[in-house]
Amino acid sequence: MKIVYIYHSFILKGGIERVFCDKMNYLAQNTSYDVTFITFEQGNHPFAYKLNDRIKVVDINCRFAELWNYNIIKRNILNFILRRKLKKCLTATLKKESPDIVISTTEDIKYNYCIFNLPYRFIVESHVHMKEIIKSSIKKQFFIHSISKIFFKWKLSKINKCKLLVALTDADKRDWSKVINSDIIIIPNILTFYPDKITDYSKRSKRILCVGRLTKQKGFDLMIKVWAKIADKHKDWKVDIYGDGDLRDTLNELINNYGLNDSITLHSSTSNIYNEHMDSSIFAFSSRFEGFGLVLIEAMSCGVPCISFDCPHGPSEIITNGKNGLLVQNGNIDEFANSLDSMINNYEQRKFMSINARIDSQKYKRENIMPQWIELFETLSKTMRI
């Protein structure tokens, strides 16, 4: 069987990139499938995550990100040209590869919609919850509201042409079922690595770990405000934030304004994040919204109790409140601060949640999730082409 994954690039380190890479690597290492990865903005950039040597990589030279270097008129002209090129090249590449199944994401629909009329079995993965896609697609400004609304409906029509949509959470499945007619199933993200041994919880540093891109979505500005409310009570505790992104200067300024330079540190992203988990006592998740929350299960696999905003979607389906972590009302900084304060003060509660977090994260291990994908592929391969 030949499986083709399509994604714009693996230049940046992120959850989608990590999961796509892990799934392709698993299939290449553990099945007889031929796996091909098609990108269109990778160019000569190194891959953020290492791909198995059995995976065939094809890059189609369509650099949409570079269009922002031009004025709006030239940008739109070049955008039209690039989209025609992408359609032609994707069509030719798929014809050459002749895949049994093609997999893409809801985020890339705006680019690769042009191939959904081709006679292949298409699967679309939803890595950003549906309501956020609506919010980002339909602008508030009156003069472009109608146009963006039409664009969103057009986008849904393209998703409807796919054989199947795979959601990461039950909540996201319910949301998608209201707006598309395609079949929808749930397969959660896989846990990249489940350590055989972890550091004894009693020997860990008094630090709170946060991980993610430095963007508004990840809510690190909220986390800084949370810590500002209780930092004076816990002078022997530190907050370490790992990630890269455009908001680094803004977040550093916020840290400075609150006088938290001695207790909050922004670090660049690291390829050894599990080492950081092993030396952390709490994992704080401050996202405004998520598709799943991969970093939560990574922390839990290392026995780190988590505290999270109950944002849409993911945390409430991963964290059982009071058992393996704590959930607080989405965006409620005071409640988050109070819950974090209580968590810090109650070592026995943290140790109890640490044990349960490690146990509960096992269901996301590759050997438990990937058979669901293989079963799906085998089932679809027995159906007639669209």
Role assignments for model-derived ranges:
Residues 88-92, 145-165, 179:
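Membrane-proximal helix-turn-helix segments that form the acceptor-binding/catalytic region
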Residues 269, 288:
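Aromatic "clamp/platform" in nucleotide-sugar-dependent glycosyltransferases that forms part
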Residues 256, 263, 276, 335, ...:
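A short, well-ordered alpha-helix in the C-terminal region of glycosyltransferases
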Residues 305-309:
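Short hydrophobic beta-strand element within catalytic cores of glycosyltransferases
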Residues 320-322, 326-333, 341-347, 362:
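Conserved acidic donor-binding segment of nucleotide-sugar-dependent glycosyltransferases
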Residues 5-13, 26, 30-77, 175-177, ...:
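N-terminal strand-loop element at the rim of the active site
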Residues 171, 190:
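Carbohydrate-associated surface elements
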Residues 14-22, 206-229, 246-253, 334:
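A conserved mid-protein helix/loop that constitutes part of the nucleotide-sugar donor-binding site
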